[in-house]
């Protein structure tokens, strides 16, 4: 199993420079993760050279869409973060009341605060659905709810965790954090058919430094983590994998973006073990699927590399989002 997984992982030489936030050398980026530059600089983070979308920029961006498209977009706040920041959510629909004949689609990002392309992908997706004629047909078929920055406190300090140190993607059963309670209430009220959770992952892991002569990096632009919980009906598990995720992979192939099912590494008795998938109801992909929804979490290659390949990462998120 280990040999098979390592075969699919691209081996890279890399130099550790502790003072730098970006762990990836430029020559590696240029050769293997070149930027996809066709995206316009229209979202807050793309408009500036440094930093990511901050809270006020997020609110301004949402307000602009509501003002420009009042017949399609509405927004409200589902609750507050632990530090008192109101959590915005968007409803995009051609109908003031949801049409029972349409699919209800839930998309969320920023559940981990150090995964900025998850939020930026959703902001760009909002722009395309509202302003690009190629995507407007979707609103004849779906009603869409977007929670772009679920963990505002963590996002503003580029930290995975909420203000109390809790991982919000391990809180779907205990529901200890106010952010979780707010999102769960909004999710239940919307009752989506399809739920998609945008994330990013760290390509350079501490365990990887012990593999090969120089360490390795995970090369996949996107990894998919859909439910492995056996309490989810088999037909739902099968259709997620063989229809929805399969279509997403085809969309990524068109952009020459690499993908695979999610893998993680961990130490066990001094050895590095790789595992795939997840079955715990604490995480979103399983919790949402246990509500009889078509649910997938996907991870974009991006944590720990700053703004490197940022448009490539956003393109990855858009490809998966629109494929669903």
Functional labels for PLM-detected ranges:
Residues 4-13:
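Sec-dependent N-terminal signal peptides
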Residues 17-324:
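M14 metallocarboxypeptidase catalytic domain recognition
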């Amino acid at each position: 199993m280990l040999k098979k997984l390592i075969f699919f992982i691209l081996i890279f030489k890399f130099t550790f420079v502790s003072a730098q936030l970006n762990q990836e050398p430029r020559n590696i980026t240029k050769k293997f993760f070149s930027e996809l530059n066709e995206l316009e600089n229209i979202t807050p983070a793309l408009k500036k050279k440094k930093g990511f979308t901050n809270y006020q920029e997020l609110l301004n961006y949402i307000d602009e869409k509501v003002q420009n498209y009042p017949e399609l977009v509405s927004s409200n706040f589902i609750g507050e973060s632990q530090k008192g920041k109101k959590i915005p959510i968007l409803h995009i629909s051609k109908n003031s009341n949801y049409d029972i004949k349409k699919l209800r689609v839930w998309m969320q990002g920023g559940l981990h605060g150090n995964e900025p392309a998850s939020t930026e992908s959703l902001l760009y997706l909002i722009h395309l659905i509202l302003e690009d004629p190629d995507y407007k047909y979707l609103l004849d078929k779906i009603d869409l709810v977007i929670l772009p920055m679920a963990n505002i406190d963590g996002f503003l300090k580029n930290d995975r965790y909420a203000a109390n140190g809790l991982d919000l993607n391990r809180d779907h059963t205990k529901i200890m954090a106010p952010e979780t309670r707010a999102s769960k209430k909004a999710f239940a009220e919307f009752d989506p058919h399809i739920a998609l959770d945008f994330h990013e992952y760290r390509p350079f892991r501490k365990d990887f430094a012990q593999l090969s002569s120089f360490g390795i990096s995970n090369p996949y632009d996107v990894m998919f983590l859909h439910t492995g919980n056996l309490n989810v009906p088999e037909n739902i598990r099968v259709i997620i994998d063989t229809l929805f995720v399969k279509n997403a992979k085809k969309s990524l192939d068109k952009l020459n973006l690499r993908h695979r099912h999610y893998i993680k590494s961990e130490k066990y008795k001094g050895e590095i073990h790789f595992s795939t998938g997840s079955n715990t109801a604490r995480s979103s992909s399983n919790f949402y699927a246990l509500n009889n929804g078509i649910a997938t979490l996907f991870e974009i290659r991006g944590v720990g590399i700053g703004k490197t390949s940022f448009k490539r990462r956003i393109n990855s998120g858009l490809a998966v989002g629109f494929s669903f």
